[in-house]
Protein backbone atom coordinates (compact mmCIF):
# COMPACT_ATOMS: atom_id res chain seq x y z
CA UNK A 1 0.00 0.00 0.00
CA UNK A 2 1.77 3.17 -1.17
CA UNK A 3 -0.93 5.75 -0.49
CA UNK A 4 -3.54 6.34 2.16
CA UNK A 5 -6.91 4.66 1.49
CA UNK A 6 -10.21 6.05 2.82
CA UNK A 7 -13.44 4.06 3.25
CA UNK A 8 -16.37 6.36 4.06
CA UNK A 9 -19.57 5.83 6.03
CA UNK A 10 -18.43 2.75 7.89
CA UNK A 11 -19.70 1.91 11.37
CA UNK A 12 -17.25 1.34 14.19
CA UNK A 13 -18.12 -2.36 14.16
CA UNK A 14 -17.40 -2.56 10.40
CA UNK A 15 -14.10 -0.80 11.04
CA UNK A 16 -13.09 -3.41 13.62
CA UNK A 17 -13.65 -6.18 11.04
CA UNK A 18 -11.63 -4.30 8.41
CA UNK A 19 -8.81 -3.67 10.90
CA UNK A 20 -8.38 -7.40 11.56
CA UNK A 21 -7.10 -8.02 8.03
CA UNK A 22 -5.69 -4.61 7.09
CA UNK A 23 -2.02 -4.12 6.32
CA UNK A 24 -0.25 -1.10 7.78
CA UNK A 25 -1.98 1.43 10.04
CA UNK A 26 -5.80 1.40 10.16
CA UNK A 27 -7.61 4.23 11.99
CA UNK A 28 -11.26 5.25 12.37
CA UNK A 29 -12.02 8.98 12.39
CA UNK A 30 -15.46 10.55 12.05
CA UNK A 31 -16.97 7.48 10.37
CA UNK A 32 -14.10 7.08 7.92
CA UNK A 33 -11.65 4.19 7.89
CA UNK A 34 -8.16 5.52 7.11
CA UNK A 35 -5.56 2.96 6.04
CA UNK A 36 -1.92 3.98 5.69
CA UNK A 37 1.19 2.12 4.60
CA UNK A 38 3.79 1.13 7.16
CA UNK A 39 6.16 4.01 7.96
CA UNK A 40 9.47 4.59 6.17
CA UNK A 41 12.91 3.99 7.64
CA UNK A 42 13.49 7.73 8.14
CA UNK A 43 10.13 8.08 9.86
CA UNK A 44 11.00 5.23 12.23
CA UNK A 45 14.40 6.75 13.05
CA UNK A 46 12.79 10.04 14.06
CA UNK A 47 10.09 8.22 16.01
CA UNK A 48 12.71 6.16 17.84
CA UNK A 49 14.78 9.24 18.67
CA UNK A 50 11.73 11.07 20.07
CA UNK A 51 10.60 8.00 22.00
CA UNK A 52 14.07 7.62 23.53
CA UNK A 53 14.19 11.28 24.65
CA UNK A 54 10.65 11.20 26.06
CA UNK A 55 11.17 7.86 27.78
CA UNK A 56 14.25 9.25 29.54
CA UNK A 57 12.36 12.39 30.59
CA UNK A 58 9.37 10.46 32.00
CA UNK A 59 11.44 7.80 33.78
CA UNK A 60 10.27 7.75 37.41
CA UNK A 61 7.32 10.06 36.66
CA UNK A 62 3.62 9.15 36.57
CA UNK A 63 3.12 9.60 32.81
CA UNK A 64 3.95 6.84 30.30
CA UNK A 65 5.20 7.05 26.72
CA UNK A 66 3.80 4.77 23.99
CA UNK A 67 4.86 4.39 20.36
CA UNK A 68 2.91 3.11 17.38
CA UNK A 69 1.25 0.79 16.89
CA UNK A 70 -0.81 1.46 20.02
CA UNK A 71 -4.55 2.14 19.74
CA UNK A 72 -6.05 5.23 21.35
CA UNK A 73 -9.85 5.25 21.46
CA UNK A 74 -11.46 8.67 21.77
CA UNK A 75 -15.10 8.55 22.90
CA UNK A 76 -17.63 11.36 23.20
CA UNK A 77 -21.14 10.04 23.87
CA UNK A 78 -21.97 7.65 21.01
CA UNK A 79 -19.14 8.99 18.87
CA UNK A 80 -16.08 6.72 18.71
CA UNK A 81 -12.77 7.37 17.02
CA UNK A 82 -9.67 5.19 17.05
CA UNK A 83 -6.27 6.65 16.24
CA UNK A 84 -2.78 5.20 16.25
CA UNK A 85 -0.44 8.13 16.92
CA UNK A 86 3.27 7.78 16.29
CA UNK A 87 3.88 8.65 19.95
CA UNK A 88 1.53 9.39 22.84
CA UNK A 89 2.12 10.41 26.44
CA UNK A 90 -0.56 9.18 28.84
CA UNK A 91 -0.83 10.55 32.37
CA UNK A 92 -4.34 9.36 33.34
CA UNK A 93 -3.96 5.60 33.87
CA UNK A 94 -7.69 4.90 34.27
CA UNK A 95 -8.28 4.20 30.56
CA UNK A 96 -5.85 1.33 30.00
CA UNK A 97 -7.17 -2.01 28.75
CA UNK A 98 -5.18 -5.04 27.58
CA UNK A 99 -4.86 -3.80 24.00
CA UNK A 100 -5.65 -0.07 23.88
CA UNK A 101 -6.14 3.13 25.82
CA UNK A 102 -9.63 4.63 26.12
CA UNK A 103 -9.29 8.31 26.90
CA UNK A 104 -7.31 11.39 25.96
CA UNK A 105 -3.50 11.40 26.06
CA UNK A 106 -1.83 14.56 27.37
CA UNK A 107 0.55 14.70 24.40
CA UNK A 108 0.35 13.22 20.90
CA UNK A 109 3.12 13.33 18.31
CA UNK A 110 2.55 12.64 14.62
CA UNK A 111 5.39 12.41 12.10
CA UNK A 112 4.42 13.52 8.61
CA UNK A 113 4.78 11.20 5.64
CA UNK A 114 4.04 12.05 2.00
CA UNK A 115 0.82 10.00 2.23
CA UNK A 116 -0.51 11.57 5.45
CA UNK A 117 0.28 15.30 5.53
CA UNK A 118 -3.25 16.68 5.17
CA UNK A 119 -4.56 13.92 7.44
CA UNK A 120 -2.22 14.94 10.28
CA UNK A 121 -2.27 18.70 9.60
CA UNK A 122 -6.05 19.07 9.24
CA UNK A 123 -8.10 16.02 10.25
CA UNK A 124 -6.13 14.97 13.31
CA UNK A 125 -5.42 18.55 14.40
CA UNK A 126 -9.18 19.19 14.57
CA UNK A 127 -9.89 15.83 16.21
CA UNK A 128 -7.25 16.24 18.91
CA UNK A 129 -8.37 19.79 19.62
CA UNK A 130 -12.00 18.65 19.89
CA UNK A 131 -11.13 15.90 22.38
CA UNK A 132 -8.82 18.09 24.46
CA UNK A 133 -5.36 16.67 23.78
CA UNK A 134 -3.32 19.28 25.68
CA UNK A 135 -0.36 19.27 23.32
CA UNK A 136 0.04 18.08 19.73
CA UNK A 137 3.41 17.94 18.00
CA UNK A 138 3.64 17.71 14.21
CA UNK A 139 7.07 16.61 13.03
CA UNK A 140 8.17 17.24 9.43
CA UNK A 141 11.10 15.02 8.37
CA UNK A 142 11.30 16.84 5.03
CA UNK A 143 11.65 20.31 6.61
CA UNK A 144 13.37 19.01 9.76
CA UNK A 145 10.91 21.01 11.81
CA UNK A 146 8.41 20.59 14.63
CA UNK A 147 5.25 22.60 15.29
CA UNK A 148 3.81 22.33 18.79
CA UNK A 149 0.13 23.13 19.28
CA UNK A 150 -1.03 23.76 22.84
CA UNK A 151 -4.62 24.09 24.06
CA UNK A 152 -5.55 27.54 25.33
CA UNK A 153 -7.99 28.23 28.17
CA UNK A 154 -10.93 28.07 25.74
CA UNK A 155 -9.99 24.66 24.33
CA UNK A 156 -8.48 25.87 21.05
CA UNK A 157 -5.01 25.19 19.72
CA UNK A 158 -2.40 27.93 19.56
CA UNK A 159 1.07 27.42 18.15
CA UNK A 160 3.37 27.20 21.16
CA UNK A 161 6.59 26.58 19.22
CA UNK A 162 7.60 26.26 15.59
CA UNK A 163 11.22 25.12 15.42
CA UNK A 164 13.60 23.90 12.75
CA UNK A 165 16.78 21.89 13.08
CA UNK A 166 18.65 25.23 13.22
CA UNK A 167 16.99 25.85 16.59
CA UNK A 168 18.82 24.40 19.55
CA UNK A 169 15.95 22.89 21.57
CA UNK A 170 12.23 22.16 21.43
CA UNK A 171 10.30 22.35 24.70
CA UNK A 172 6.84 21.51 26.00
CA UNK A 173 4.17 23.87 27.27
CA UNK A 174 2.75 21.27 29.66
CA UNK A 175 5.75 19.29 30.93
CA UNK A 176 8.16 21.37 32.96
CA UNK A 177 11.81 21.20 31.92
CA UNK A 178 11.13 18.93 28.94
CA UNK A 179 13.67 20.12 26.38
CA UNK A 180 14.91 18.03 23.48
CA UNK A 181 17.84 18.94 21.25
CA UNK A 182 16.53 19.27 17.70
CA UNK A 183 19.66 17.67 16.24
CA UNK A 184 19.09 14.58 18.41
CA UNK A 185 15.64 14.17 16.85
CA UNK A 186 16.73 14.43 13.21
CA UNK A 187 20.14 12.67 13.40
Write out the residue ranges for each language-model feature.
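Gly/Pro/Ser/Thr-rich low-complexity, intrinsically disordered segments predominantly at protein N-termini
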Residues: 1-187
Amino acid sequence: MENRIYLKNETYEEYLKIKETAEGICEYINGIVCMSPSPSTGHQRISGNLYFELRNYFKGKTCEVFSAPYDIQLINGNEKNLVIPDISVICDKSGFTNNKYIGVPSLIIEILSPSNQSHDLITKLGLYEKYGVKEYWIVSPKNKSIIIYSLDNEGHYDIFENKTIDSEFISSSIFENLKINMKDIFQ
